[in-house]
Amino acid sequence: MQAQALLHLLQLSSPSLPIGAYSYSQGLEAAIENGTVKDEVGARRWIIDVLHEVVARFEAPVLWRLLQAFETRDAAAVESWTERFIAARDTAEFRAETIQMGYSLGKLCSDLQLGDAEMLALLQAQTEVPLPTALAYAAVTLKVPAEAALLGMLFSWAENQVLVCVKSVPLGQVAGQRLLLSLQAELEVAAQVAQQLPDEELSNWSPGLSLLSMQHEVQYSRLYRS
């Protein structure tokens, strides 16, 4: 990867990217609240389970397909995978999360004038823009290789999950970094699965996670919006 592409990838993966990722836990806060996650071992188990059962089998594969669609400027594919991703957000919090973050990143891309008029039209043609669509657009217009963009997305997701555990379990800073290091091989496997999974095998079937998300909507005390 060229240095410029690497720098763009680091910017897209940075916690300082102004899309509000830090304000969401994707159900993890509810799992901490009910005692499912209460220490470093439980945190690692939770993150790995969600990574392989949900993220690697749906969110990452959809991002991979959107990266290809924007690269080839395939308007029909962009629309189809965007709509499919939104339809798969099965709770109010999960849907609001991806739409808010996608809108913020899409607006940032527009404000920074990333991409030509044809590319921008592909993005703006979507009724709603979830995060994977905006992220794919940003990566393609910044010429970040698809494989790197996919791994960057997975790392950002894992880092955010670890930060939730550090704040809410709570875990120490060293434990958080140890946990993040221990996830590297798992992230590589998830990236490979996302690239190889056929369309008919994509699935976000995770009823337990969905129930936790719904419980989180009425959780009395919380730090996160999901």
Curated annotation (Swiss-Prot):
It comes from Janthinobacterium sp. (strain Marseille). The keyword Cytoplasm applies. Required for maturation of urease via the functional incorporation of the urease nickel metallocenter. HAMAP family: UreF. InterPro entries: UreF, UreF_sf. It is found in: Cytoplasm. Belongs to the UreF family. This is Urease accessory protein UreF. Gene3D superfamilies: Urease accessory protein UreF. UreD, UreF and UreG form a complex that acts as a GTP-hydrolysis-dependent molecular chaperone, activating the urease apoprotein by helping to assemble the nickel containing metallocenter of UreC. The UreE protein probably delivers the nickel. The keyword Signal does not apply. One of its GO terms (cellular component) is cytoplasm. The lineage of its organism: Bacteria, Pseudomonadati, Pseudomonadota, Betaproteobacteria, Burkholderiales. Keywords: Chaperone, Cytoplasm, Nickel insertion. GO terms for molecular function: nickel cation binding.
